[in-house]
Amino acid sequence: MRVILLGAPGAGKGTQAKFITEKFGIPQISTGDMLRAAVKAGTPLGLELKKVMDAGQLVSDELIISLVKERIAQPDCANGCLFDGFPRTIPQAEAMVAAGVDIDAVVEIAVDDEEIVGRMAGRRVHLASGRTYHIQYNPPKVEGKDDVTGEDLIQRDDDKEETVRHRLSVYHTQTKPLVDFYQKLSAANAGKPKYSHIEGVGSVDAITAKVLAALS
């Protein structure tokens, strides 16, 4: 089964991706990992990619699609794969269709922007240990201090409200249109890929149950 997981940053895709890959025994494929692996392996495509990246240029959709086709032909993808952060744009999605890369299921995890801002902007981290807290859902015993060491907690730049809002606005401009694209593709192709919209609010277990039901 080949699955695309859509959703804004902070919607909980990473958590659900882990459950999906374990349940179906399929690898999670990210373009970043694929790029690094191809360059390291020194394949003809890898060498071409290295040239582009060394020149500080953006890797074209055409090269990325070639990379995807090379990756999904590998033995560990025999039962399918989960695409992580790809496609990001309509041209990439169209290129996948044109290249004959069939997708079985597209799952959108939908979470309201304000909920995401609350989730992410409330995170606090103890850098030395990696322990994470949340000012609302999982607060430390003493405000701003790590429970174990009593050292200061910090808010990572990625979790600051203005950064979160910027990432959400990029998502709505670039990636949200994929929701319409795959809904229309599914309707035009007698339900292939199967498209599912899931509300990503509630307990992790409840959301996982909905995601797995959508894929069964």
Swiss-Prot record:
Task: Supply the PROSITE patterns for this chain.
Answer: ADENYLATE_KINASE (PS00113)
Give one GO biological process term: AMP salvage
Q: Which Gene3D superfamilies match?
A: P-loop containing nucleotide triphosphate hydrolases
Q: Per its UniProt entry, what is the enzyme's top EC class, as one word?
A: transferase
Q: What is its EC number?
A: 2.7.4.3
Catalyzed chemical reaction(s): AMP + ATP = 2 ADP
Which parts of the sequence are annotated with region: LID?
Answer: 122-159
Instruction: Please name the pathway.
Output: Purine metabolism; AMP biosynthesis via salvage pathway; AMP from ADP: step 1/1
- What does this protein do, in the record's words? Catalyzes the reversible transfer of the terminal phosphate group between ATP and AMP. Plays an important role in cellular energy homeostasis and in adenine nucleotide metabolism.
Q: What family is it from?
A: Belongs to the adenylate kinase family.
The protein here is known as Adenylate kinase
Q: Tell me which species this is from.
A: Pseudomonas putida (strain GB-1)
Q: Which gene encodes it?
A: adk
